[in-house]
Amino acid sequence: MSDTIHVLNGPNLNLLGTREPGIYGAATLADVEALCRTTAAQHGLELVFRQSNHEGDLVDWIQAAAGSVGVVLNAGAYTHTSVALRDAIAGTGVPAVEVHLSNVFAREPFRHHSYLSPVVRGVICGFGPQSYVLGITALATTRPARP
């Protein structure tokens, strides 16, 4: 198993810091990345941090993460629409945590359904950038012991 954790971000997360700050906060994606790098390093892990507005990129990156510690995935709106992301997680068996900056259950009803939740280890939402920290920590501290 690789000592790498993948943090993958979906559509519109490149707009963090300017997009609806009342919902998503003032932190930019670069701020989130810095927080993730610090957290991964505290657990002795390398970090791959990526963002794309394109579903196929996310599928490719999930597949490439097979054999790693896992994936922390904020799929954005694809959470509620993407069978392809669901199938990539299920098909690779990569340990994954679904994260969201906002509490999706306190928002519009269409955000309450996730195609990803049934195939990930856990879901963390509503803690802003700390959702990522919690996701990284969860994967780092629950991974199988190395032989």
UniProtKB/Swiss-Prot annotation:
SUPFAM superfamilies: Type II 3-dehydroquinate dehydratase (SSF52304). The record marks 19 as: Transition state stabilizer. Keywords: Amino-acid biosynthesis, Aromatic amino acid biosynthesis, Lyase. GO terms for molecular function: 3-dehydroquinate dehydratase activity. Its EC number is 4.2.1.10. GO terms for biological process: amino acid biosynthetic process; aromatic amino acid family biosynthetic process; chorismate biosynthetic process; quinate catabolic process. Homododecamer. This is 3-dehydroquinate dehydratase.
